[in-house]
């Protein structure tokens, strides 16, 4: 999975390009209009009252701009962004150290917040509700509890699996926002903006071609733009036009739907090996040699959103659209029931 060009999961190579292309204001942020409107109103209201923004939960597939929004919020609130992840915070003491290092209006961004362990999560409750940290010093009969005041901070949690959050944690977020896949026009705008920052000329037609193969995900769009730029530097004349874009994307083996070999392997398995489905995700993951979480978090959301598979009580089933994509005959008995 790490080598997939169209994986929305974060890669090391994404750091420099994302940092350089990242918008610094909500007004510069393309797409996610409903999320932006809410955050714009709530940040302005918080600043008018000299309060920290209420805690924010951003959920949805990876690569849609959660970290970018956290950066913008920290900048808008006049604080510093501190970034960590659920798996990285192993003990309550780790979380206590992070919380006590914050200053007023700082933003603590926790990626994969659904993976916080329960003991760590529990010390977050008073921190989120009352800006206090309860810690226990000593053991046994000599143990005593100390309450520390915390600065006015904002916790931004990000997750691809909102259903795995416990109710007590989820209920302590004042702002819950679903991040949605981007449409092709939004991605085209992102690609044209990124092209200017990178100093490369990209035609609108070429930008749209890259956009429609970017799986609705800005991270993938910017990654593909970098690879098309490489191709253009070697094979072109300095301008990314439609032919350069198509040839580069063909070389990367990304088809017109934004699918690579793995996506097509999933569809082929459902149709050719399981008669169109339904087939359980565990069985499917085993058959194609991927982890169950990878299927659920990385591949399935886009296939569902594009209408190539559907969820059924007994598993996943390929749609007529998937049959057409693979040039398979869609027989009457394979229709969805």
UniProtKB/Swiss-Prot annotation:
Gene3D superfamilies: 1.10.8.60, P-loop containing nucleotide triphosphate hydrolases (3.40.50.300), Winged helix-like DNA-binding domain superfamily/Winged helix DNA-binding domain (1.10.10.10). Homohexamer. Forms an RuvA(8)-RuvB(12)-Holliday junction (HJ) complex. HJ DNA is sandwiched between 2 RuvA tetramers; dsDNA enters through RuvA and exits via RuvB. An RuvB hexamer assembles on each DNA strand where it exits the tetramer. Each RuvB hexamer is contacted by two RuvA subunits (via domain III) on 2 adjacent RuvB subunits; this complex drives branch migration. In the full resolvosome a probable DNA-RuvA(4)-RuvB(12)-RuvC(2) complex forms which resolves the HJ. SUPFAM superfamilies: P-loop containing nucleoside triphosphate hydrolases, Winged helix' DNA-binding domain. It comes from the Bacteria. The gene is ruvB. Residues 256-337 are annotated as: Head domain (RuvB-H). Has 3 domains, the large (RuvB-L) and small ATPase (RuvB-S) domains and the C-terminal head (RuvB-H) domain. The head domain binds DNA, while the ATPase domains jointly bind ATP, ADP or are empty depending on the state of the subunit in the translocation cycle. During a single DNA translocation step the structure of each domain remains the same, but their relative positions change. Its main location: cytoplasm. Transmembrane segments: none annotated. It comes from Clostridium novyi (strain NT). One of its GO terms (cellular component) is cytoplasm. One of its GO terms (biological process) is DNA repair. This is Holliday junction branch migration complex subunit RuvB. It catalyses: ATP + H2O = ADP + phosphate + H(+).
